[in-house]
UniProtKB/Swiss-Prot annotation:
Residues 9-68 form the Sm domain. Residues 71-88 have a biased composition (Basic and acidic residues). Residues 66-88 are annotated as: Disordered. Belongs to the Hfq family. GO terms for biological process: regulation of DNA-templated transcription; regulation of RNA stability; regulation of translation, ncRNA-mediated. The lineage of its organism: Bacteria, Pseudomonadati, Pseudomonadota, Gammaproteobacteria, Vibrionales. This is RNA-binding protein Hfq.
């Protein structure tokens, strides 16, 4: 998985799973609103009164209507949680 998607996928998945309304701004300035129904590597399926398939390369910004809790999949440990080196 590409590094960019390790942040993107959990964020979009949290928006989808929690059914958080989003505003999606396209690179041409158009604003779309709805809920993320599904997504893959190239598109987002946005549901409102109709379903719209939006190509990710056309998206500038995704703005959730409220805060979203998400994890990047990579857990970061505090320095105290790291195993200490032992010398044999």
């Amino acid at each position: 998985m590409a590094k960019g998607q390790s942040l993107q996928d959990p964020f979009l998945n949290a928006l989808r799973r929690e059914r958080i309304p989003v505003s999606i701004y396209l690179v041409n300035g158009i604003k779309l609103q709805g809920q993320i129904e599904s997504f893959d590597q190239f598109v987002i399926l946005l549901k409102n009164t109709v379903n719209q398939m939006v190509y990710k390369h056309a998206i500038s910004t995704v703005v959730p209507a409220r805060a979203v809790s998400h994890h990047s999949g990579e857990q970061q440990r505090a320095p105290s949680d790291r195993p200490e080196k032992t010398e044999d």
